[in-house]
Amino acid sequence: MGLTKAIIDNINMSSANYIEIFLREQNLQRTSSEEGMDTRSWVNLLLQSGRLNEDTFERFLQEELFYGKRKQIRVYKLEDCRKYVYASDWTKGLERYSDGQSENFSNILGMQPNEEHPRKIVFASMKKNEQAELENIKILFACFIQVSIGRDKFEDSCSYIPVEIDFRRKRMTMKAWQRHNIAWEWYKTDALLDDILDILNKSFQIEVEAFGINHKKVLYAMSRNLINDAYLKIPAFGEVANLKETISNFSNDIIHTLSLIHI
């Protein structure tokens, strides 16, 4: 399938083409015949010709879609983890939503949701302890949406919802980016997050409970970790690497004002 407009829209910003910044970091430059090509066409040509390694590009997409552009965050406390603590507990659900794949895989370029199959898992990464129990699992959901591109005109697109489960801390986080020009209410961020939570419950037996007032200290610590995730784990393209100290100070400044949704 290759690079799609939907993937580009979830990574690039109007002020920065992060995909082409990455390509320059890989020492890839347009040839004279490639001048004027849009990003999508150029990347797919690079992939087809072998000048851009697909696994390398997939890793870039993993990082960007998991940590970049994710402004809305939900934090949950896990209940009975014993129901889904082994990789085998996840096999059936992963295979259902990832076209037959399970455990560790990445197929962001090869899988896109559609109206018939509106939810796909395009990336999964599991970390286990010596007893083969899961310590951490990361899953990236791709959700079919439509955006408005004019009066009564709509375009098929995709929103990515990263989910991370920390079994040691009994914590689950879900992140999302507020897309603009969403065509219908059921494609908006909160509706997508609710739907993914329902899938996790029904297909993976994930159960969560609300954080109460007695969990304020825990939530504060979680908030610090989430801010570090959001601002320190973005791929370090040159200028970002130089901002580490500034970002650290910024995290401290906003810790009391950032609106996190603790359900």
Locate the predicted segments by residue:
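Generic beta-strand structural signal
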Residues: 165-167
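Acidic (Asp/Glu-rich), glycine- and aromatic
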Residues: 184-201
